[in-house]
Amino acid sequence: MAAEKILTPESQLKKSKAQQKTAEQVAAERAARKAANKEKRAIILERNAAYQKEYETAERNIIQAKRDAKAAGSYYVEAQHKLVFVVRIKGINKIPPKPRKVLQLLRLTRINSGTFVKVTKATLELLKLIEPYVAYGYPSYSTIRQLVYKRGFGKINKQRVPLSDNAIIEANLGKYGILSIDDLIHEIITVGPHFKQANNFLWPFKLSNPSGGWGVPRKFKHFIQGGSFGNREEFINKLVKSMN
């Protein structure tokens, strides 16, 4: 007797085809994501190489300009700085309302907190108002990079989130072309077109007390008078290094 042919119900056939289609879609989506991630990594690596070349070229140009000025018997005058890093060095006691509001505006709500500030006529006026309560100056590429890598946190839904993955940065700043931590650093260093968005994404930096203390007999005197507050220009890098 011939074996009976077992017929698969039509509903079961449809289910099997649907499952097969779903599996194929999942595989296709996975392959597409893998290809997109590979392309993205290549873009990030290419950008990083371009950034490094840009930084090195700028540094060489400054060194050469200083040599040329010296050879000509004159002085090298740097271009006007576009960025300062500001550190709050005084607590809440005895700060008048107006400077206190400016500190809040610049997100310097705690002692030893620090933020980047774009240099404009308006921000220079704000810095004058809070000068007795902050130290600030012109951060180097190395200082900015170390700050972001070591102390960098993003503000996501009002939460402080560590920048542990480029995906976090892309999810929040990708619409501005900022895909990685080095894109973020470049936008800050160059005070690029999306500096405001990049800077606002960064949570104010929480720094430590300077290693070895402030090293001055009177902290609340101006830096040029042997104290700690005010504009210390390039010397801000030494301070940040001791607090990072």
Curated annotation (Swiss-Prot):
The keyword Mitochondrion does not apply. Its main location: cytoplasm. Keywords: Cytoplasm, Ribonucleoprotein, Ribosomal protein. One of its GO terms (cellular component) is cytosol. InterPro entries: Ribo_uL30_ferredoxin-like_sf, Ribosomal_uL30, Ribosomal_uL30_CS, Ribosomal_uL30_euk, Ribosomal_uL30_euk_arc, Ribosomal_uL30_ferredoxin-like, Ribosomal_uL30_N_euk. Present with 101000 molecules/cell in log phase SD medium. NCBIfam families: uL30_euk (TIGR01310). Component of the large ribosomal subunit (LSU). Mature yeast ribosomes consist of a small (40S) and a large (60S) subunit. The 40S small subunit contains 1 molecule of ribosomal RNA (18S rRNA) and 33 different proteins (encoded by 57 genes). The large 60S subunit contains 3 rRNA molecules (25S, 5.8S and 5S rRNA) and 46 different proteins (encoded by 81 genes). Belongs to the universal ribosomal protein uL30 family. This is Large ribosomal subunit protein uL30A. The lineage of its organism: Eukaryota, Fungi, Dikarya, Ascomycota, Saccharomycotina.
